[in-house]
UniProtKB/Swiss-Prot annotation:
Pfam families: Peptidase_M28 (PF04389), PFF1_C (PF22250), PFF1_TM (PF22251). Glycans are attached at residues 50, 99, 156, 912. Residues 647-660 have a biased composition (Acidic residues). It comes from Sclerotinia sclerotiorum (strain ATCC 18683 / 1980 / Ss-1) (White mold). Keywords: Glycoprotein, Hydrolase, Membrane, Metal-binding, Metalloprotease, Protease, Transmembrane, Transmembrane helix, Vacuole, Zinc. Its EC number is 3.4.-.-. Belongs to the peptidase M28 family. The record marks 363 as: Transition state stabilizer. This is Vacuolar membrane protease. Zn(2+) 2 binds at residues 232, 267, 364. Binds 2 Zn(2+) ions per subunit.
Length: 1076
């Protein structure tokens, strides 16, 4: 019975270790990636939190679409104010409310709001619990109440944003005026100033600091017009509510002040967060935690962080999750979407961005509801938020106080932060350290590792034990032929195989991208399996084939050397990016190269066990002489006992056997056959094709090559025809090398690979490059399988055979399968535009043309129409805009039964424009019905604008960029309110002020789709589109209604004037005709 040494470098042991390592790493990784830690069975396990209450709040909050431009948004806002009151009353906290309006500030000393909140959104619990102990210290502080709630109806925002990055040429801006209606809840900390300090001094006072600064948690309570907003951002909102409950519980009283910001208007342009910056409380905030949702459930990940110190607060979470690679994606411009985090970071706050991130197919759709998330996901974000904010509010050091590192005037004085590196391990351990530390490690590794390898190689060479790159050596006897050591055998196998295999892997990814590019949308694991099994199978076939033809004991060592060289080059690039661009994701290559360096060092150091080359040559010559003598004796030996002078048949057979023995044990030289000669092979069967090569007799108890003779004096032979001196190599060092380059490296690489693919595999419907996720899968498949490549030639044939069959199956599936399903729905972007002058309406569906045309064929109102599709990179690059005439909208309730809706279009929007004499300036009066969002769109850029009654422009932003703007977005906090806007444009060459005007359109937006029949074209698209499709909003408004009139006699840049001007014009024309 054979007994294998588990540490011997033989196929059975290598195969077993490979299976154990890869399964032991990837089974936990996949479980963590696909599941969420369970919520505690006791919903009140943590004092001050109530998970059941939070879940009921989420269900109430996500009971309908509530975009900023909808009546439901007001219901949600009033519900939030009521819930804050109920929480504070439940904790019996003395608090005040400040109803801040544009003109006055009314302060109430108790919560006595009587808001119109729908019954369905009433609070889930009765908070008048007599069992709650009354805490006098919190209710009656010296001067000030413990909590202040700001009902902010005063803060406004005015600025600009440049148009799409994908547009070539000079980019124009989109100017914006926004009236905010945020809710701010301030919980006073023990170290905070007493009194209403926020009322002292100017809002824009420079460098003013109150106490030791505050900690803010931000969440937006508006949703998109086609999503219920459960995770975007309902979970964040109810988490902030629970944090108010937590910090107003006496045992959890914060040392530093805590601010909960419920901002409104994030989905349309981060407007709520920008409006907050003009509020007095903005100067109090030093650190923040932004809660977001870019998926629908799963784990909440740490998207990004401003610095190392604030990230250490997140490390206190029980189940941390995230990697700095995601932060690098944003900072490098690779990810172009943004959250409120970018607003607060630009203001100088130090903080974190925590968000849900998958599945993206449910993001902004009607599946972003409580049914498609879970209480476990809610708990994951809530528990991480509590741990983070508790750490920040208890930090009384100077970490977040003091002069800034950038010395920028006007920013909060919140200390000096350092760029950081962070990542989790199995969702349990969180590593955080400074980027400068990583840079020091990188630089040290770049310099020290090659020097150490060269130094050890030099010592080996001095001792005549460096067998790498060793050729033929002449013996002391000049008559003897040079003896080959075989040191170059296998030197270039690894790079050639890696190049060929990688090229085939990328070619396969390109093939899928060409034939069925969206398959990764619903089947990312099929693509992973295809890519990984292809690389593994091809790599094994080439390396095992080379080893079959010319076995080499140095193949493993050469593989590590090449891996070290390639890794060193990548580390150079990573180090440059760390230093120049502050990119921290290079930690992957630092750990990778460190592990490969140690494995390479072992591969070199194990040659200390080999004999000196000169000694080996002498021993080989002696063995050769002994073998010749033995052979001579076997042939010429006496047969006196038999008295026979002639050899018989048995003697001839014995002679042949002896000759074979001599030939088998003779040292190989130039005349040795390439295949079939050499020493007895002890290699197990690698494959059916190679079976004969390894069917050689070995002792039953053989457990691999040894580095010396066994106890019985039997000489140990090299493995499978490898160089004879390799019999002296240790048999266990491969296992140490495998453990170095295997488990830990696979964990950090596997987590990042799974994270990136999960984040990007469903972005193709957004217009992102379709090949990108396939490229990432191919790259990480290679990186994840590189640790096994130095040992791959010792694997049995069973693994590559099985993997090749898996590759064939997944390849066929990826080529022919339909890429979408009800669980992974394709996103079609919807918008309906109406010309309010002519009554013409067009429905536009945006996406990949192949699938959009498929969807439109199922829509009844589009039947028989010619569908026109064209690109519009200014709005969404990479997608097609396909339009048809749709069912007229009824967003304004002025439709008379039996009368076509378009007859009432003219009443939806009215405007008047007056020209300032002798100036390039005009004043617009705009009114929309059942909307609080309108837009002025110009055909040519303007240089300045001002909204009457608006707040003073912030110095931190320009209302209009240097390139000029061609749009002004106007957002009211009130309904059906008129805008009065002054617009001014530059004087052209050879022109005088007042000689030229501007043409364009006045547009108003409608976004409330809660009631069926209001936007029947949207209802129809959602009802009749295939089950693998979801219809989501394209722009700020689901419906855009616009007016335009060009008349040269009353021209102010082509704008339609009011009715009085139209009447005057008509009267003048009538007199002119009568005269003629």
């Amino acid at each position: 019975m054979k007994c294998y040494n588990p540490s011997a470098f033989v196929p059975m042991a290598v195969t077993l270790v490979t299976v154990v390592i890869y399964l032991g790493v990837f089974i936990p990784l996949l479980i963590i990636h696909e599941t969420v830690p369970s919520a505690p069975d006791d919903p009140t396990l943590y004092n001050g939190l109530n998970l059941t209450e939070a879940w009921l709040d989420l269900q109430s909050l996500s009971d309908g679409y509530h975009p900023f431009n909808s009546r439901k948004n007001d219901d949600v806002r009033n519900w939030l104010l009521k819930r804050i009151d109920e929480i504070l009353d439940h904790n019996q906290i003395q608090y005040t409310t400040e109803n801040e309006t544009a003109d006055t500030s009314d302060v109430q000393l108790e919560s006595d709001f009587d808001k119109d909140v729908p019954e369905s959104m009433s609070g889930p619990n009765n908070f008048n619990d007599d069992s709650v102990e009354y805490h006098e210290d919190l209710r009656t502080r010296k001067v000030s109440p413990a909590v202040t709630v700001f009902n902010d109806l005063r803060s406004n925002y005015s600025s600009n944003a440049l148009t799409s990055i994908g547009v070539k040429g000079r980019r124009l801006g989109i100017s914006t005026y926004f009236e905010g209606n945020n809710i701010i809840c301030y919980v006073r900390g023990n170290d905070d100033e007493e009194g209403e300090w926020w009322k002292t001094g100017s809002v824009n006072s420079k460098g003013k600091m109150h106490g030791r600064g505050g900690v803010m948690v931000n969440a937006h309570f508006d949703s998109v017009s086609t999503g219920f907003g459960a995770t975007d951002d309902g979970v964040g909102v109810v988490t902030a509510l629970q944090l108010i409950r937590y910090f107003t519980t006496p045992e959890n009283r914060p040392q530093k002040g805590f601010v909960a910001l419920f901002n409104n208007g994030e989905e349309d342009g981060l407007y709520g967060a920008k409006a907050f910056l003009s509020h007095p409380m903005a100067k109090f905030v030093h650190t923040f935690l932004n809660l977001e949702g870019a998926g629908a459930g799963g784990r909440a990940t740490l998207f990004r962080s401003t610095d190392t110190e604030v990230t250490r607060a997140y490390a206190h979470a029980k189940h941390p999750f995230g990697t700095v690679v995601s932060s690098d994606g944003f900072s490098s411009g690779f990810v172009r979407s943004e959250t409120d985090y970018v607003v607060f970071r630009a203001e100088g706050y130090r903080g974190l961005d925590v968000a849900f991130w998958q599945p993206r197919s449910q993001y902004h759709t009607d599946q972003d509801d409580a049914k498609h998330t879970s209480i476990d996901s809610l708990w994951h974000m809530l528990s991480a938020s509590v741990a983070t904010t508790r750490s920040l509010t208890r930090d009384t050091s100077n970490t977040f106080v003091g002069p800034r590192s950038d010395d920028k005037i006007g920013k909060v004085s919140n200390g000096k932060g350092s760029d950081g590196v962070w990542f989790d391990i199995f969702g349990t351990v969180f590593a955080v350290f400074r980027l400068r530390t990583l840079f020091a490690w990188s630089l040290t590794l770049l310099i020290a590792s090659p020097l150490i390898l060269f130094a050890v190689s030099y010592l080996l060479n001095r001792q005549e034990k460096f067998y790498f790159f060793a050729g033929s050596i002449k013996s002391k006897n000049p008559e003897d032929e040079p003896i080959s050591l075989g040191g170059w055998r296998g030197a270039f196998r690894f790079p050639i195989t890696l190049f060929i295999t990688s090229a085939i892997t990328f070619a396969c990814a390109s093939l899928i991208n060409k034939i069925n590019p969206m398959i990764i949308y619903s089947s990312p694991y099929a693509v992973w399996s295809m890519s990984a099994t292809l690389f593994f199978s091809v790599f094994w076939f080439i390396m095992a084939g080379c080893n079959f033809v010319r076995p080499s004991a140095l193949q493993r060592g050469y593989a590590f050397m090449w891996m070290f060289v390639f890794g060193w080059i990548l580390l150079v690039v990573a180090t440059v990016y760390e230093d120049r661009f502050k990119i921290s994701g290079g930690y992957l290559f630092v750990f990778y190269e460190a592990a490969i360096f140690l494995a390479t060092l072992i591969a070199i150091c194990e040659q200390f066990a080999l004999p000196r080359k000169s000694t080996y040559i002498e021993d080989s010559q002696n063995d050769h002489s002994d073998n010749q003598d033995h052979h001579h004796q076997a042939v010429m030996g006496t047969d006196g006992a038999n008295g026979a002078d002639e050899p018989n048949a048995d003697d001839e057979a014995a002679e042949e056997d002896q000759e074979e023995t001599v030939n088998a044990t003779a040292f190989p030289h130039e005349t040795t056959p390439l295949i079939g000669g050499g020493q007895p092979s002890h290699r197990a069967s690698v494959s059916t094709s190679f079976a004969n090569r390894y069917r050689q007799v070995v002792p039953e108890s053989y457990d691999g090559p040894a580095d010396h003779d066994d106890k019985k004096g039997h000489k140990k032979h090299p493995y499978g025809g490898e160089q004879e001196w390799s019999a002296k190599l240790p048999i266990w060092t491969w296992l140490v090398q495998y453990l170095l380059v295997g488990p830990f490296i696979l964990v950090i690489l596997g987590q990042v690979g799974l994270f990136l693919v999960a984040a990007l595999h469903q972005t193709g419907t957004d217009g992102s490059p379709l090949f990108l996720p396939y490229l990432i899968v191919a790259i990480f498949s290679i990186l994840l399988l590189l640790p096994v490549t130095p040992f791959i030639h010792r694997l049995t044939h069973h693994m590559p055979t099985f993997f090749f069959l898996v590759f064939i199956g997944t390849l066929i599936y990826n080529l022919v399968a339909f890429p979408f399903s009800p669980n992974n729905r394709y996103k079609a972007y919807f918008q309906q535009t109406v010309d309010l002058d002519t009554g013409v309406n067009r429905v536009t569906l945006v996406g990949i043309e192949q699938y959009i045309r498929n969807i439109i064929t199922n829509i009844p109102s589009a039947a028989g129409q010619s569908i026109n599709c064209e690109a519009n990179p200014r709005i969404r690059s990479g997608l097609s805009f396909c339009s048809y005439e749709g069912i007229p909208p009824q967003v304004v309730d002025n439709v008379v039964e039996g009368v076509p809706p378009e007859k009432g279009y003219s009443d939806w929007l009215s405007f008047n424009v007056s020209r300032v004499p002798n100036e390039n300036k005009a004043t617009f009066h705009i009114s929309g019905v059942e909307t609080r969002a309108c837009i002025l769109r110009f055909d040519d850029p303007f240089s300045e604008f001002k909204v009457h009654g608006g707040a003073k422009s912030e110095e931190r932003w320009d209302d209009v960029p240097d390139s000029g703007s061609d749009q002004i977005k106007l957002w009211h906090r009130d309904w059906n309110k008129e805008w009065v806007v002054d617009v001014e444009w530059a004087v052209g060459e050879d022109m005088k002020p007042g000689d030229e005007g501007r043409s364009g359109r006045v547009v108003c937006l409608w976004s409330d789709a809660n009631k069926r029949g209001v936007i029947p074209a949207l209802d129809e698209a959602q009802r009749f589109s295939p089950q693998w499709t979801s219809v989501v909003k394209l722009m700020d408004g689901l419906v855009e209604g616009s007016k335009r009139r060009v008349g040269e006699l009353v021209r102010v840049g082509g704008w339609k004037k009011g009715r009085r001007d139209d009447f005057s014009l008509a009267l003048g024309l009538a007199f002119l005709l009568a005269y003629v």
